Amino acid sequence: MPNAAAAQRRHLIPFAAVSASYFAHIGFFNPYLPLWLKELGFGLVAISILTSVQAATRLFAPYGWGWLSDHTGERVKLLRYGATMALVCACILFFDLGPLGLGLVLLVMFTHTSSMMPMSEAAMAHLVSQGGAFDAKRYGRVRLCGSLGFLVTVFLAGAWFEHFGMKHFPGWTVLSLAAVTASVWWLPDLKEAVPTQEIKLSVGPVLKQQPVLWFFITAFFHVLSHIGVYVFFSLYLDALGYSKVWIGMLWAVSVIVEIIWFFTQAKWMPKLPLTAWLVVCSAAMTLRMGVTAQWADVLWVLLLAQALHALTFAANHTVCIALLSHHFPGRLRGRGQALYTVIAYGFPGVLGGLLGGLMSDRWGLQSVYWVSMCTAAIATAAAYKVWRLQHPKQKAAGLA
């Protein structure tokens, strides 16, 4: 057993590198892409459309990649292909592209990067669930590396862009995706067995289960509430007069509390059933968006709102991955992760990005956060429904 545990740890180290490099890429790309597009001369509506391309690819790419990975067992080889193609696309950002050309490059790049976390999470969930139960402690340690990567680049990029301007954004993109590609090629070439009797397993019967259906409704509205942060937060702070350094620092606060949560979550998670955590996380999101809408110009209040990210993202993410691993085991795991990406990030990303752009253009960026507060309240109600449906079953299933 000690040898098996040591082998599992060795296998998880490359996954930690993938998590660190991928979220290092996200740490500068997502916060500063809108500001780069703004410097290129695009208006709010055009920026919202271009930033929504990433979410649009999550409507089809994750499930396609998930289907391939489930039916071939070759998650690692597919990850390597996706990372390499994304790096090639990033090199094209150096050229002077019009809105259509830029949109096309982003479409191809995001089609390949959008597959990376679902497949990586599925492969990692397989490793940390081999004892029969989801190991939140080991998962948290690996995911913590991603948060550290995000933290480093959001700090460095903010200072860099403040001093040198946004013209170096394509260079940062290429360097970060080169790191992702290198780390993906370091992954052990583990192929999951594909038993012929399991190939025809369908996700349909799982989706018809009431707790699963309400779980996805919760995930949809919870992440829809986050779009105000993912797409418009940097623009909102910029409009309020915050410098790029302070924008980076405010992003960093959310990542620091995220790191603390991932490092200590094994201590806190057993205190409540997983579905009860869903309720807590969405309720915290309702509070966070309301505070951001009303008091974003008060620094210390905004800092406290950002600190709620420990619950609204970190805790929520771990709970969702654990529930997915429970409801979509074995050969269903890749498609379960992909469905989560499509429903929780694809549709909300497209709707939130496009509607948020229209709202902010008409009523100002603050309006996005008031609407986000309302969608978070809907997520809270849906999470409560999940808890009511599943709570009696959780202790027996090892999910309490």
Model-derived segments and spans:
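Juxtamembrane intracellular "pre-TM" segments in multi-pass secondary transporters
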Residues: 2-9, 187-219
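Helix-loop boundary and gating motifs at the non-cytosolic
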Residues: 5-55, 212-250
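Hydrophobic core of transmembrane alpha-helices in multi-pass small-molecule transporters
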Residues: 20, 89, 99-117, 220, ...
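Interfacial helix-cap and linker-helix signal at transmembrane-aqueous boundaries
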Residues: 37-38, 68-69, 144, 159-162, ...
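Helix-to-loop junctions at the C-terminal end of transmembrane segments
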Residues: 60-74, 161-162, 260-273, 360-361
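Structural signature of the two symmetry-related core transmembrane helices
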Residues: 77-91, 276-291
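Cytoplasmic helix-loop-helix junction between adjacent transmembrane helices
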Residues: 107-145
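A membrane-interface helix-boundary motif in multi-pass transporters
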Residues: 159-175, 358-376
